[in-house]
């Protein structure tokens, strides 16, 4: 019997799940919104919310714990420098999950998971800067 066994296995080994959640958390912190299946979104939400709470706590130990979970120091910096101050006055509930229909092909339920007060202008900012730099290079060489 599986009484009081929390969490979904998602048809993956423990190491695969751990790596997948680390990758999804990194992507969610980077883009502040991702589209995934509904069960994965429900599983990643408490992980990322605990990371934001670590960011709000600050301190060296909290930063090291976040690095161990995310494995990307750049995203940890964003977590501690950008997201933590944004949610300083909010006690939990940093993420929202919105159902997004069903995936074509296998009819899996999809969901959008995003930060509640996310910066809409930041989405794709890296791509816009890269494209703008390429256009400037073309303009100077022509």
From Swiss-Prot:
Source species, domain of life: Bacteria
GO cellular component: cytosolic large ribosomal subunit
Keyword Ribonucleoprotein tagged: yes
Alphabetically ordered keywords of this record: Ribonucleoprotein, Ribosomal protein
UniProt record, GO biological process: translation
GO molecular function, one term: structural constituent of ribosome
Keyword Ribosomal protein: yes
Family: Belongs to the bacterial ribosomal protein bL17 family.
Subunit-structure text: Part of the 50S ribosomal subunit. Contacts protein L32.
Family annotation (HAMAP family): Ribosomal_bL17 (MF_01368)
Name of the protein in its database record: Large ribosomal subunit protein bL17
Organism whose genome encodes this protein: Bartonella tribocorum (strain CIP 105476 / IBS 506)
Lineage, broadest ranks: Bacteria, Pseudomonadati, Pseudomonadota, Alphaproteobacteria, Hyphomicrobiales
